[in-house]
């Protein structure tokens, strides 16, 4: 018998801004680090303000040498308040995962 292939799902291991953090200024980008390489065109975020309104972001991308890190540019300057990052990611083996976290920009 040959061993069965192991298929893991990508796990979120780090964020920038950090989950539940309070930062002083608007971030220029959101970065998500995962345990597996991702397919950027099938991965991304919805960034929402504290009223639940979607904030404009650019397309998600990965660096050629680090496909485990997803980078999403923030197009507009964010005002003070709480923001929620609703993310979804598809790994190279096509497993899809999703989740969310929040951060706050101080007054």
Predicted regions and their residues:
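N-terminal non-catalytic regions of secreted/periplasmic and cell-surface proteins
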Residues: 6-43, 107
